Swiss-Prot record:
Family the entry assigns: Belongs to the succinate/malate CoA ligase beta subunit family.
GO cellular component, one term: cytosol
Keyword terms of this UniProt record: ATP-binding, Ligase, Magnesium, Metal-binding, Nucleotide-binding, Tricarboxylic acid cycle
Catalytic class of the enzyme: ligase
UniProt xrefs under PANTHER family: SUCCINATE--COA LIGASE [GDP-FORMING] SUBUNIT BETA, MITOCHONDRIAL (PTHR11815:SF10), SUCCINYL-COA SYNTHETASE BETA CHAIN (PTHR11815)
Annotated SUPFAM superfamilies: Glutathione synthetase ATP-binding domain-like, Succinyl-CoA synthetase domains
Binding annotation for substrate: N264, G321, I322, M323
Source taxonomy: Bacteria, Bacillati, Bacillota, Bacilli, Bacillales
GO terms, biological process: succinyl-CoA metabolic process; tricarboxylic acid cycle
Pathway: Carbohydrate metabolism; tricarboxylic acid cycle; succinate from succinyl-CoA (ligase route): step 1/1
Domain ATP-grasp residue range list: 9-244
Function, as annotated: Succinyl-CoA synthetase functions in the citric acid cycle (TCA), coupling the hydrolysis of succinyl-CoA to the synthesis of either ATP or GTP and thus represents the only step of substrate-level phosphorylation in the TCA. The beta subunit provides nucleotide specificity of the enzyme and binds the substrate succinate, while the binding sites for coenzyme A and phosphate are found in the alpha subunit.
Reactions that this protein is recorded to catalyse: succinate + ATP + CoA = succinyl-CoA + ADP + phosphate; GTP + succinate + CoA = succinyl-CoA + GDP + phosphate
Record-given protein name: Succinate--CoA ligase [ADP-forming] subunit beta
Amino acid sequence: MNIHEYQGKEIFRSMGVAVPEGRVAFTAEEAVEKAKELNSDVYVVKAQIHAGGRGKAGGVKITKSLSEVETYAKELLGKTLVTHQTGPEGKEIKRLYIEEGCAIQKEYYVGFVIDRATDQVTLMASEEGGTEIEEVAAKTPEKIFKETIDPVIGLSPFQARRIAFNINIPKESVNKAAKFLLALYNVFIEKDCSIVEINPLVTTADGDVLALDAKINFDDNALFRHKDVVELRDLEEEDPKEIEASKHDLSYIALDGDIGCMVNGAGLAMATMDTINHFGGNPANFLDAGGSATREKVTEAFKIILGDENVKGIFVNIFGGIMKCDVIAEGIVEAVKEVDLTLPLVVRLEGTNVELGKKILKDSGLAIEPAATMAEGAQKIVKLVKEA
């Protein structure tokens, strides 16, 4: 689950992570009133959407004038902002964050992530702040420093100071930076985050260390422990199909291809998408039906996939372990009938009760193309979509 920058900064502030003063506004008039409350000489007007790259896309404005705060607010509110993370369709700006400006001395990058190679939380930092960390990693990887964190001990003060020294935080601000990083790590752990990222972290002319940005992603599996976090969810920022999928315990992510995918298991889903790409196709989605799919769940999965008007064919790739192939087959048959499917459909089943599942599909009399392997299924659906 993602949240807005201003919500992230409220969490930071409540847990001892230093941030500039700021207020959220939903109208141009409110933006001016919130700016007045800051009692600052410099104002930063920031578009609030669930995507990075806002500054480069024109979604961040700096001014010393209250009248310009109003002008910028009117310009941004209601505008569709397109960044490298939104896709070409962009996202509509429905709220702004009005923040006090600060005398920036230097910009840095810091982030806590889960390193899948070590299965531990890792602190990443660089003195190349304000730019995409992926670019830094590609062009100057030697400028990224990492600290692997022992889950029993947590982030140690010496690790925080070492990172501060490595990214050339001024000596007079090293202790403040270490305190900042320790507080930020506490946010990551206490709120069950999957990512906590600040780009940029800045040092100021006064020697302060502040978070000028706040990106927080939460582990969806732990949200039951954080009712306060769930209340921050902005459904308007999410794909309606993803929202509908979550209601049925389906993991769905929309992509920009034309071949719908329904798979059980995240690993198999990614392998399926890679195989489709390998044979010249483009997946329209990631959809993990999980290990406990019912007939009803399969039907909902089909409806969600078909909610994407770009879909020209569907590939179902199921390995029946906990999930039995005959149950899936029955669900597929019911779903095809209920949604009156006219698009090409390829189904590959393997595992528990696979022969019974194949018989159910064959006896249905429906236009369902069987496949014995994932590769065969991917080839078939790519061919059928291209011929359609």
